[in-house]
Design a protein with these regions (language model features):
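A conditional alpha-helix N-cap/helix-loop micro-motif detector
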Residues: 17, 80-84, 146-147
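Short, glycine/charged-enriched secondary-structure capping and boundary segments
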Residues: 18-21, 50-53, 113-116, 138-142
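Membrane-proximal helix-turn-helix segments that form the acceptor-binding/catalytic region
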Residues: 88, 107-110, 114-118, 144-158
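Acceptor-binding helix/loop patch of EC 2.4 sugar-transfer enzymes
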Residues: 8, 65-75, 94, 118-151
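Short N-terminal targeting/anchoring amphipathic segment
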Residues: 87-108, 121-124, 128
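Generic structural signal for helix capping and beta-alpha/helix-loop junctions
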Residues: 13, 45-47, 70, 108, ...
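Internal alpha/beta domain cores that form substrate/cofactor-binding pockets in large enzymes
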Residues: 73-81, 89-91, 110-121
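N-terminal subdomain of nucleotide-sugar transferases
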Residues: 1-64
Length: 158
């Protein structure tokens, strides 16, 4: 089976951060599946557009995007939507049988649902954060318009 795996913050063992998606994808490959990972490259890069690498049999499609925890909320939201738009286009260009998308951010649901409908294939959505409840509780989403939009995205995704 050809599996499209969407995770904006995919990490390999030599990168800092969690490797849950890497481990899942690696094991799916080991079971005989083809896995196509769509993710972002968050470090400085010479690449200006998508580039592909192979990691333990996983076809990893990287989109260079500038992202930092030091960004403002507005800057982060722009990055999330930029990645969603570009990954939606990339997703429909791949010939796959099923889509597996994992959050966070919740905007990963946008390219997953779009590609699922466009390609007429099933989609599985893994929720790994209670969003937007968590950022609201933490005080990160204070603006009423932002909260409203976050709740609309939540209804769409869930």
């Amino acid at each position: 089976m050809k599996i499209l795996y969407l995770h904006q913050y995919f990490n390999t063992p030599d990168m800092s951060g969690g490797t849950r998606s890497y481990e899942m994808a690696r094991r799916l490959v080991k079971m005989g599946h083809e896995v196509y990972m769509i993710t972002s490259w968050r470090e400085n890069s010479d690449h200006k557009t998508w580039y592909e690498t192979a990691v333990e049999g996983i076809h990893v499609h990287w989109l260079p995007v500038n992202y930092s925890n030091h960004m403002s909320n507005i800057e982060r939201i722009k990055v999330f939507f930029k990645f969603a738009l570009f990954s939606a286009r990339k997703a429909v260009s791949l010939k796959v049988d099923i889509i597996f998308a994992t959050s966070t951010p919740l905007t990963i649901a946008l390219p997953a649902v779009y590609a699922s409908r466009k390609l007429k294939i099933p989609m599985v959505f893994e929720v790994r954060d209670l969003w937007p409840e968590l950022p609201i509780a933490m005080g990160a989403l204070k603006n009423p318009v932002t909260r409203f939009m976050a709740h609309r995205l939540e209804k769409f995704a869930y």
